[in-house]
């Protein structure tokens, strides 16, 4: 009996702060994302843009987007396409229109030099007012196609930083939970992390049934 009580207490402690975080952003606020020509959006709050329709919608509060430069420059026979690595941008926004532009460059040589840097001077604004943001240049993997599994790389980055997105809304795991997860494994396939993710995506009724099942183990 003591073992059952301990198991229930363990799961309540494990998910308690997470459940609270999941209900932080219950009211949807109209925040749309637009970008300058040549700035490609790859992910919005953990969801691939292949699964989203435009204009992309953000939430009131913490947001994360993955973007890269994908731009044609030059004219005629000298016209070429330049690409940067994907960058993870994090920021907080309120209602309105959020706009992202890339730093300017005149030719491919300038672009290549700019893309070598770990950070770029992205121009991020909400309702025409500049806002602060964090950025991380995704390193990619070794080989000919370093970003072919970008979704897995993003999930691993978020896991190691204690960030999870449920239904397009950000959930931050507690520092203790995030540290514990990182120490146990650096893979996204951690059973503990899978359990956290599954619990976050449950309805209230499913959570009650789950906790009932846990108490019976």
Swiss-Prot record:
Q: Which InterPro entries match?
A: UPF0319
What's a Pfam family this protein contains? DUF2057
Entry keyword set: Signal
Signal sequence segment: 1-21
Say which family it is in.
Belongs to the UPF0319 family.
Q: What is this protein called?
A: UPF0319 protein VP1009
Species whose genome carries this gene: Vibrio parahaemolyticus serotype O3:K6 (strain RIMD 2210633)
